[in-house]
């Protein structure tokens, strides 16, 4: 339970400068940078345009439109955190218009910068850097795609914005081998070995973090060298981190890793990505590789011989979320990143795992007898991966490969853990529904699923597809190391049925540890990492199997005090100041049942007297770029 006499309903004290809206600023940040390039092709007859001397030719294609007519409306309604459906459609219509009528990527970029500033999408410096970073890849993607503006926005913003089905009617082939009868795992015998697995995710190291700078600057990421000083009446960024739109200095990550002793010892480590900071408008490949090598070296230094098994996050690439499928070759491919990962992680991974990592950023290995670990590249399911506009049908053949791995494990009698970054309930519909189907088919083999990305502490329950009523698996979504946005730093430890013959390898319990930033940033204080809570003890769970998590959701529907405890822990002991009333509570609980995207039927029993689309619309999925 929470320490220091702080009740779950109150949370830890917030600084006076923090605004209630701060937490929301990070949610759509990828789309905003996406948007910077989309604007590039608008207003082709504007008097502010100029033609660079060195113009690279563009292919022509498109649906002509008059984007200029909606520009005044956009200027009035559009903000840094507000991408509406009409705006999205206008922007992609403008893309087609520009590609048809203009002749250079450089021209496209010049218009994008001017419109980004005009419509106040971002500060001028961010507009300039973002457009220059995204323009080449985005123009390449759009000229190779076959989507209309409505379909593109349906892909990015969901089915309520557009009908997107060009690539959605695909299915993974399952083997003809009959599915064995469901066999829920049995509790281990008393005294059976228990393994402790350290889970790290979303570290987000900011090389330019600087104590004393403005934590509420105008840029998407603050507490940095270029953030400037805070207003005279406000304190600056804390030494160890800040409750704002800020990432972590290296010293806080060093403190985390050096202070793991009380939570250990660990048998292995699952590390699910997002190493670089959120300054996505100004990142180079060199920056990303520096983050990869620096943090990998830090993990090796403090964890020594403990085996570490990483997964690829959406922030590892630049532009952010840009993960081309393997059919994209040359300089625009992800070869530069996967090769660097293979080199950095070679001490932890066998040759076959390194081979598939180099191809598509995913791999499988056997960390111990009877257990198979599969690390997925969840960027191939992401709405924010703009390369999927070209073709989103099972990118890199990863899901079909997953089926092969699971069938082989079933044949051997092995159990399987899956790790990844983006949770399956946040994926493109076709990918998510296929993954859901795979999980149901191999429910006896699949012993655990572990993801990150959302920065908060939650889970996703899977059900049988026929009735959507029998819980059969659960994906654990662990909280982030970073404070972004307005959170305490944290990490997770899983207790797993241990290494012995006949082990189920299922999760028995989990623990969450945090650093209380309020205390750590006090003058003369030293950072302290402490146990925030244990899941079974805090929630009164009989075990950590899927049915227990299903039951917890429905208990929280009726027990508001229990939900307030969950809400407090969901935010790592630092919840927003605004209360979470009934609509917020139902939407949050619906998210815990939604391991399959665009599937409101999963919440039908949770809100029998309400409109399911209305309730689901209240759940703002944390699309942290």
From Swiss-Prot:
PROSITE patterns: SAP_B (PS50015). Gene3D superfamilies: 3.60.21.10. It is found in: Lysosome; Lipid droplet; Secreted. Zn(2+) 1 binds at residues 202, 204, 274, 455. Proteolytically processed. Mature lysosomal form arises from C-terminal proteolytic processing of pro-sphingomyelin phosphodiesterase. Both lysosomal and secreted forms are glycosylated but they show a differential pattern of glycosylation. GO terms for cellular component: endolysosome; extracellular space; lipid droplet; lysosomal membrane; lysosome; membrane raft; plasma membrane. Its cofactor is Zn(2+). Residues 1-40 form the signal peptide. Disulfide bonds join 85-161, 88-153, 116-127, 217-222, 223-246, 381-427, 580-584, 590-603. The keyword RNA-binding does not apply. The modification Phosphoserine is found at residue 504. It is an enzyme of class 3 (hydrolase). It holds the Pfam family Metallophos. Residues 1-20 are annotated as: Disordered. Its EC number is 3.1.4.12, 3.1.4.3. Binds 2 Zn(2+) ions per subunit. Keywords: Disulfide bond, Glycoprotein, Glycosidase, Hydrolase, Lipid droplet, Lipid metabolism, Lysosome, Metal-binding, Phosphoprotein, Secreted, Signal, Zinc. It comes from the Eukaryota. SUPFAM superfamilies: Metallo-dependent phosphatases, Saposin. It catalyses: a sphingomyelin + H2O = phosphocholine + an N-acylsphing-4-enine + H(+); N-(octadecanoyl)-sphing-4-enine-1-phosphocholine + H2O = N-octadecanoylsphing-4-enine + phosphocholine + H(+); a 1,2-diacyl-sn-glycero-3-phosphocholine + H2O = phosphocholine + a 1,2-diacyl-sn-glycerol + H(+); 1,2-dihexadecanoyl-sn-glycero-3-phosphocholine + H2O = 1,2-dihexadecanoyl-sn-glycerol + phosphocholine + H(+). GO terms for biological process: cellular response to calcium ion; cellular response to UV; ceramide biosynthetic process; cholesterol metabolic process; negative regulation of MAPK cascade; plasma membrane repair; positive regulation of apoptotic process; positive regulation of endocytosis. Converts sphingomyelin to ceramide. Exists as two enzymatic forms that arise from alternative trafficking of a single protein precursor, one that is targeted to the endolysosomal compartment, whereas the other is released extracellularly. However, in response to various forms of stress, lysosomal exocytosis may represent a major source of the secretory form. In the lysosomes, converts sphingomyelin to ceramide. Plays an important role in the export of cholesterol from the intraendolysosomal membranes. Also has phospholipase C activities toward 1,2-diacylglycerolphosphocholine and 1,2-diacylglycerolphosphoglycerol. Modulates stress-induced apoptosis through the production of ceramide. Belongs to the acid sphingomyelinase family. Monomer. Interacts with SORT1; the interaction is required for SMPD1 targeting to lysosomes. This is Sphingomyelin phosphodiesterase. It comes from Bos taurus.
């Amino acid at each position: 339970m929470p320490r220091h006499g702080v009740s779950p309903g109150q949370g830890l004290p917030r600084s006076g400068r923090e605004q209630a809206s701060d937490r929301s600023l990070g949610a759509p940040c990828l789309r905003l940078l996406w948007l910077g390039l989309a604007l590039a092709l608008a207003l082709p007859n504007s008097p502010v345009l100029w033609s660079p001397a060195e113009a690279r030719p563009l292919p022509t294609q498109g649906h002509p439109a008059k984007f200029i007519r909606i520009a005044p409306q956009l200027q009035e309604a559009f903000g840094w955190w507000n991408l509406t459906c009409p705006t999205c459609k206008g922007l992609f219509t403008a893309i087609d218009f520009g590609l048809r009528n203009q002749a250079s990527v450089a021209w496209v970029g010049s218009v994008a910068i001017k419109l980004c500033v005009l419509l106040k999408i971002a500060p001028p410096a961010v507009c300039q850097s973002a457009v220059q970073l995204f323009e080449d890849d985005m123009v390449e993607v759009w000229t190779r795609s076959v989507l209309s503006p409505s379909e593109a926005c349906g892909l990015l913003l969901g089915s309520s914005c557009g009908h997107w089905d060009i690539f959605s009617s695909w299915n993974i082939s399952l083997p003809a081998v009959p599915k064995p009868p469901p066999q829920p795992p049995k509790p281990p015998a008393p005294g059976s070995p228990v393994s402790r697995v350290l889970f790290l995710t979303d570290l987000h190291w900011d090389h330019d973090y600087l104590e004393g700078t403005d934590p509420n600057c105008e840029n998407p990421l603050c507490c940095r060298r270029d953030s400037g000083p805070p207003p005279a009446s406000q304190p600056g960024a804390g030494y160890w981190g800040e409750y704002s739109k800020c990432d972590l200095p290296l010293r806080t990550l060093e403190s985390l890793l050096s202070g793991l002793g009380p939570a250990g010892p660990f048998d292995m480590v699952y590390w699910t990505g997002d190493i670089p900071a959120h300054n996505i408008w100004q990142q180079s490949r060199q920056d990303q590789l520096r983050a990869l090598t620096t943090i990998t070296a830090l993990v090796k230094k403090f964890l020594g011989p403990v085996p570490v098994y990483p997964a690829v996050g959406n922030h590892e690439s630049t532009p952010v979320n840009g993960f081309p499928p393997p059919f994209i070759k040359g300089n625009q491919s992800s070869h530069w990143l996967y090769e660097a990962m293979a080199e950095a992680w070679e001490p932890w991974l066998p040759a076959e795992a390194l081979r598939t990592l180099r191809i598509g950023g995913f791999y499988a290995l056997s960390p111990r007898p009877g257990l198979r670990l599969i690390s997925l590249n969840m960027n191939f399911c992401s709405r924010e991966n703009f390369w999927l506009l070209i073709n989103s049908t099972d990118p890199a053949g990863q899901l079909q490969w997953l089926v092969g791995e699971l069938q082989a494990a079933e044949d051997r009698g092995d159990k399987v853990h899956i790790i990844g970054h983006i949770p399956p309930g946040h994926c493109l519909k076709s990918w998510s529904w296929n993954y859901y189907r795979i999980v149901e088919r191999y429910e006896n083999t699949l012993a655990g699923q572990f993801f990150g990305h959302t920065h908060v502490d939650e889970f996703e329950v899977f059900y049988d597809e026929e009735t959507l009523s029998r819980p059969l698996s659960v994906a654990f979504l662990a909280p982030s190391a970073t404070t972004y946005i307005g959170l305490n730093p944290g990490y997770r430890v899983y207790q797993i049925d241990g290494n012995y013959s006949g082990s189920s390898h299922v999760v028995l319990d989990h623990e969450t540890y945090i650093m209380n930033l309020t205390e750590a940033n006090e003058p003369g204080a030293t950072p302290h990492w402490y146990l925030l809570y244990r899941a079974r003890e805090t929630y009164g769970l009989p075990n950590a199997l899927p049915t227990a998590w299903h039951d917890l959701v429905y208990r929280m529907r009726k027990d508001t005090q229990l939900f307030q405890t969950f809400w407090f822990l969901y935010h790592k002991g630092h919840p927003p100041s605004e209360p979470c009333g009934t609509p917020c509570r139902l939407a949050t609980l619906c998210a815990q049942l939604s391991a399959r995207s665009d599937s409101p039927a999963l919440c039908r029993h949770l809100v029998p007297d309400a409109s399911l689309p209305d309730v689901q619309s209240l759940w703002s999925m944390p699309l942290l770029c």
